[in-house]
């Protein structure tokens, strides 16, 4: 566990919550230490780890991983675009095949579900495709902006 960091901006002091390193399968990332983790292997979407805020169950991170030897980010974008185009209209929106998130090249899109949305960032690290989904209620993306940026910035393949 990393200790809380104090960041000073002028006369204001902001306390950053403690973090921990989550390692799951071939992937590791930094998450808030007090958020709960759960493996989700059923229901819609890919098998994933869900990391949920203790303050609001609608605020969560989702992390998926897939081995993709030889895949490129443009290839990932084409594959995702085909899947999105085959889905019901309005569920997957704001597709960007060549975005930058937390300083990293990524494919991004937003998943819209009843009561919440998930902003997905898809990265390649070697032969592993990593997807980080940042879930919040509509209009409440600010509740996890820093947590999401930290997850995307820190996520990487291990082993």
Which residues does each predicted region cover?
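Conserved polar/disulfide-associated segments of primarily extracytoplasmic proteins
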Residues: 9-13, 39-147, 153
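Short, solvent-exposed mixed-charge patches
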Residues: 158-159
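N-terminal "mature-domain start" segment
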Residues: 8-43
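Hydrophobic single-pass membrane-targeting/anchoring helices
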Residues: 1-5
């Amino acid at each position: 566990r990393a200790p809380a960091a104090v960041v000073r901006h002028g006369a204001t002091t902001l306390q950053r919550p403690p973090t921990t390193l989550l390692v799951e399968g071939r992937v590791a990332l930094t998450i808030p230490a007090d958020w709960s983790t759960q493996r989700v292997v059923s229901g819609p979407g890919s098998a994933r780890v869900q990391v949920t805020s203790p303050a609001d169950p609608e605020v969560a991170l989702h992390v998926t991983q897939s081995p993709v030897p030889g895949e490129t980010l443009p290839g990932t974008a084409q594959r995702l675009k085909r899947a999105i185009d085959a889905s019901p209209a309005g569920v997957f929106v704001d597709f960007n095949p060549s975005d930058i998130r937390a300083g990293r090249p990524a494919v991004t899109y937003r998943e819209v579900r009843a009561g919440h949305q998930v902003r997905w960032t898809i990265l390649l690290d070697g032969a592993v495709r990593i997807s980080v989904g940042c879930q919040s209620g509509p209009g409440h993306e600010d509740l996890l902006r820093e947590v999401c940026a930290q997850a995307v910035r820190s996520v990487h393949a291990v082993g």
